[in-house]
Amino acid sequence: METSYFLGANTASGFLSLYDGFCRGEGDYLHIVKGGPGTGKSGFMRAISREAVRRGMDVEYVRCSGDPASLDGVYLPALHMGWCDGTAPHVAEPGIFGVDSDYVNLGTFCRTPLSSADTDRARALTAAYKEKYAQAYALLAAAKSTESALAPQELGEKEVLRAGAALCALVERLPAGESPRLRRRFAGAVSCEGVLEDRSSYELCKLVYLCEDGCALAAGALSAACEAALARGHRVILCLSPADGVTPDALILPDASAAFVRAMPLSSYEHVRRIPLDRLCGDMAAVKERRRAVRAARREGARYLSAGCETLREAKALHDELEAVYRPYMDFAALDALTAKEITRIFS
């Protein structure tokens, strides 16, 4: 079984990280991979994951929000072992070195310092791609400003509570869990490839509740359902919006093989049950007006999001150039030897 998700998000507030909860459970051991641009961090982790898949093991992939084709982390549940990119913007450090975590330094295979010309090039490219990220975050902030139209207005708090009660009732019907634990992640990303949704976690669930969200009630309802699930003893994976890093987008209950998902086109899934939250509001005239306001606000936000993604594409192109500056300085033969040695150690 292979699943993937994001632990970093490009948002209106800048980069948000959830890496502090990665591979931090009881018995887990985290290898923090260090190294500069182009030093092979993603390739190193991908080689480990390929061997795990070859051996029939479950693998969790943490995708990079800046470049979704690249890996920022890998976790092997059967071994309670993980690896993550510990460099900025998601810097990671050991909890207790040698006890629950350590370093893997791939920078040792990079012959530094750079030449004078490459030093100037690296400085210029670093400044340029960081400026692009700042521009992208400003556009995402503009997108977020439309959220005021999504907050309950005509409908009010009563409708949000009613929607929450409906989801809590569904949680109560599920078998109770035995060890409540909350994990947070992003089930998508605002990225150089556009606004992505990674549905691999939902696809593993036997039952998916799709919360139809024309009136923007699902976020509050999912928060209530999360509290109810924890109270029932469930392990809970709370998936936050990659656009703002705060709003709940989905709730996954692994023990019950169930998920509650907001505003995603899942009609092709075999086990989807639709929850029309808008119909709980009673006054359909107010509902229709609210839907129109929400659609207009989402269209406006989508324009800013699209511009933000285009700017992130420009940032990635600059970062690719930066990686190319470092590549000639890398001893990839030595890196390959380390990778092979590490794979032997892990799976021996």
Where are these regions (language model features)?
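A cross-family "folded-core" feature that marks the main globular domain of proteins
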Residues: 33-34, 44, 60-63, 96, ...
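An accessory alpha-helical subdomain
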Residues: 121-175, 293-339
